Amino acid sequence: MKRIGLILMAVFLTLACAACGQEKGTEKMKPATKTASASALTEGKGDHKALVVYFSASGNTAKLAKTMAETLQADLLELQPAEPYTSHDLDYNTAGTRATVEQRDESARPKIAGNIGDLKQYDTVYIGYPIWWSLAPRIVYTFVESVDLSGKKVIPFCTSGGSGMGSSGEALAAVSKGKGNWARGREFSPNASAAQIKEWADKL
């Protein structure tokens, strides 16, 4: 009788373990939620009178902006979109994708995540961006229109796939409504050296 009881218990445990394993095997993973990071300021080693602001989709402009901020001992501010761009959004070769639609719409102003804050302490503001369809991405327009650049020297810079800076800087200056003393910017390679950046900045 005792032996039969042990056999029944073993059978019960085996069935229980099998059921448990089946439940785990069919459990569906929840899709990851894509969230926006707030735009954040990184303080440089200088006197906090110069600020490098940038938007980067692929990382090229980010690399350049970080080298520039370190070289010029400037504070660094990355513009993060409230709605992050996906790979599909950035498919420039497909009509109807987000980036294509935004760039074709002169009134498009994508929201920036987080609070930009007050720029009063800065005398010089460098604004970096990739070139999209010969212009700065519309989120950079959002930034220019949402801050007070009065009395500041404003210097645009960019990375591109070969199209050059074009009139992208002038287009940004136009939406600033006369605020800021805009200098002519230039295109850089993402791998620009500190020496190249310093030589350029010293001539501004």
Question: What do these predicted ranges mean?
Answer:
Residues L15-A19:
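C-terminal motif of bacterial Sec signal peptides marking the signal peptidase cleavage site
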